[in-house]
Design a protein with these regions (language model features):
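Bacterial N-terminal signal peptides that target proteins for export
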Residues: 1-7
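N-terminal signal peptide c-region/cleavage motif recognized by signal peptidases
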Residues: 17-19
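Extended carbohydrate-recognition surfaces in non-catalytic/accessory domains of CAZymes
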Residues: 23-116
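Aromatic-lined ligand-binding clefts that engage carbohydrates, nucleic acids, or primary amines
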Residues: 66, 109-136, 140, 176-178
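Solvent-exposed beta-strand/loop surfaces of large extracellular or lumenal domains
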Residues: 77-86, 139-160
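First transmembrane helix
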Residues: 213-244, 352-370
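Interfacial "cap-and-anchor" motif at the non-cytosolic start of specific transmembrane alpha-helices
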Residues: 261-303, 307-316, 325-445
Length: 445
């Protein structure tokens, strides 16, 4: 049987005094849905309240004094990462700027479906930062672990939640509640809470929707999954050049390629699985891998061009890397949360300055490599170094107003993905040229 999967916005019920984000004293009426074999996005109306109380999951709680919010997206709206449709700004744009912590969303839905039909919910696919989903007061699940003082956050992924109670005579009223936690690391002008509403429908339709959402998520990160394999292959080729016992050194190039492969693969690991928590991902990426990658790539190009091999550059980069790691850890919003905001702001500002010094040393190394070497191989190497730099210094390019992502065919492709794809091709050609040059030298002996 073919099922039509469609996402239709619900009719907004109730009056608003000023806007959808303002407080309302009007009780939210129950929304009625005739499902059949279909899927409906639960765009609203929702009751919303900051704070946390597990009793708010109960259908018996009076939420008439809560705020009323609408999650209906603008036509064509999608998230800024992989292109998932249905995006709306978070609570920071809805009267709660600067708020970090817990909040609840509640809505009542009367479903008029087929008798004994299996119903399910598709969880929200974009939430700052994690959530638990309840139906009629019963916890259905969610991507976060809420057992500690603050939740352990994992990536929000497309998820199906079977509804526990089948409609009696085809009709049932559900109280859907979402307990949301926003992590300090997600603070931002548009952030906070649900960005893409959950959907309700018959189980088969929800399964199809889930497959579509996973396909979109897969397409958004498939390049990040493939590029690390290419980086590892390039590292193996560079290591083979070392085995030839040439006078050139490639150990820093091998290290830089492997670190970059890890950096890219770690993003896929976080967004496709629940192996790594948000804080673990933050430490591995921002505190460890990024500083190490900046240093090793500068040393890799120094050795490639054969310029100024005195130890001063290595000593400076080691010091900068250690400083970068310490400052980056201090500046993490979740680390040592009792520390003053001013201390963290200073640490993050100093990280920006360290990155600028790293960028200056990186560009200096490329410039020194080109002086007096305007042959094809040197120009290609400089081009490859610039392409890597586009990924390494993505934050600085974004601050300069350089566009960071495009959505060809509705799927997000980042500036870094484009740059690394070009770099892989150029470096592969350069390594083959080096192999050919070494072979010619051996033949001439």
């Amino acid at each position: 049987m073919r099922y039509a999967v469609w996402l239709a916005s619900l009719i907004m019920l109730g009056a608003y005094a000023t806007s959808a984000c303002s407080a309302s004293v009007e009780p939210v009426q129950t929304v009625s849905i005739s499902l059949g074999h279909s899927v409906v996005a639960l765009n609203g109306p929702w009751r919303f309240k900051t704070g946390d109380d597990l009793r708010w999951a109960s259908p018996d709680i009076d939420d008439s004094q809560w705020e009323t919010v609408d999650l209906t997206p603008a036509p064509g709206a999608h998230d800024a990462d992989v292109g998932l449709p249905g995006y709306v700004p978070g609570w920071s744009m809805r009267g709660h700027s600067g708020y970090i912590g817990y909040a609840w969303y509640r809505t009542r839905v009367t479903v008029d479906g087929d008798k004994d039909a299996r119903l399910a919910l598709a969880g929200p696919t974009d939430v700052d930062t994690t959530y638990q989903l309840y139906a009629d007061g019963k916890l259905l699940g969610g991507p976060g672990v809420f057992s500690g003082k603050t939740p352990t956050v994992y990536s929000v992924q497309p998820t199906v939640f079977p509804l526990p109670v089948a409609p009696v005579n085809g009709t049932h009223t559900y109280l859907i509640a979402l307990r949301v936690w926003m992590d300090p690391s997600d603070a931002g002008d548009e952030n906070g809470g649900i960005h893409i509403a959950p959907s309700i429908g018959d189980a088969d339709g929800i399964d199809l929707l889930n497959q579509v959402q996973w396909l979109q998520t897969f397409k958004g990160y498939v390049v990040d999954a493939m590029e690390p394999l290419a980086f590892v292959l390039l590292a193996i080729i560079a290591a083979a050049l070392m085995v030839r016992r040439s006078s050139d050194s490639y150990r820093w190039l091998v290290a830089a390629l492997l670190l970059t492969a890890w950096l890219r693969a770690n993003q896929v690991l976080f967004f496709w699985t629940h192996v790594e928590s948000l804080h673990a991902y933050d430490v591995i990426t921002a505190v460890l891998l990024v500083p190490l990658a900046l240093a090793t790539w500068t040393l890799a190009w120094r050795d490639w061009f054969g310029v100024d091999k005195r130890p001063w550059l290595r000593h400076v980069l080691v010091a900068l890397t250690i400083i970068y790691m310490l400052l980056s850890l201090i500046g993490r919003p979740w680390f040592a949360s009792e520390a003053t905001r001013g201390l963290k702001d200073v640490a993050n500002a100093l990280v920006d300055y360290v990155r600028l010094i790293d960028a200056a040393l990186y560009l200096w190394t490329i410039g020194r490599g080109l002086i007096g070497r305007f042959r094809l191989s040197a120009c290609l190497a400089a081009f490859a170094a610039v392409l890597v730099g586009v990924g390494l210094f993505a934050a600085e390019l974004s601050k300069l107003g350089v566009q960071g992502i495009w959505f060809p065919y509705g799927t997000g492709v980042s500036r870094t993905q484009f740059a690394y794809a070009g770099f892989i091709a150029v470096l592969f050609a350069l390594l083959l040229m080096r192999f050919a040059a070494y072979a010619r030298v051996r033949l001439c002996r």
